[in-house]
């Protein structure tokens, strides 16, 4: 659903009481619900086994997203395969997203651990760290079994 933009969420008196609250208004549906569900299902595969962004998975939640990797243009034409922009845009819980975030890294450094920077192995882990903190701050309830850190490290 596309929401109408709002600048004010609420009017609050000096003593902290809420005088008036402004609820979100839906402007229109961007996609049919069935189409949106198909898109979320397809984007969940990106963070599943065999996907390009397993490193973006947050324990206790299904994450859906899309990776991006682009070579930067050379001044004289063509593309420089050593200079790239990588990204990951993700949402969680995937079934009913409460949080959406895009992480973009411009010319990430090549390292022994990441000799070929891509959206999934550079921006994915950053999304994960942000999403873990946001889940706590937003008090999001896990939608999947929570894996212990030991079980996660053993499964990798």
Question: What is each model feature region?
Answer:
Residues 1-27, 43, 47-139:
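Active-site beta-strand/loop architecture of penicillin-binding DD-peptidases
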């Amino acid at each position: 659903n596309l929401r109408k933009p709002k600048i004010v969420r609420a009017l609050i008196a000096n003593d902290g009481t809420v005088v008036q609250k402004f609820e979100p208004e839906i402007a229109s549906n961007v996609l049919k619900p069935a189409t949106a569900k198909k898109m979320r299902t397809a984007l969940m595969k990106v963070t599943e086994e065999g996907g390009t962004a397993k490193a973006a998975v947050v324990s206790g939640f299904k994450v859906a997203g899309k990776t991006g990797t682009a070579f930067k243009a050379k001044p004289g034409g063509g593309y420089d395969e050593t200079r790239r922009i990588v990204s990951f845009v993700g949402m969680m819980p995937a079934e009913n997203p409460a949080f959406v975030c895009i992480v973009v890294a411009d010319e990430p450094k090549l390292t022994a651990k990441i000799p070929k920077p891509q959206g999934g192995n550079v921006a994915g882990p950053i999304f994960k760290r942000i999403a873990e903190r946001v889940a706590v701050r937003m008090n999001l309830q896990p939608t999947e079994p929570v894996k212990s850190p030991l079980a996660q490290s053993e499964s990798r």
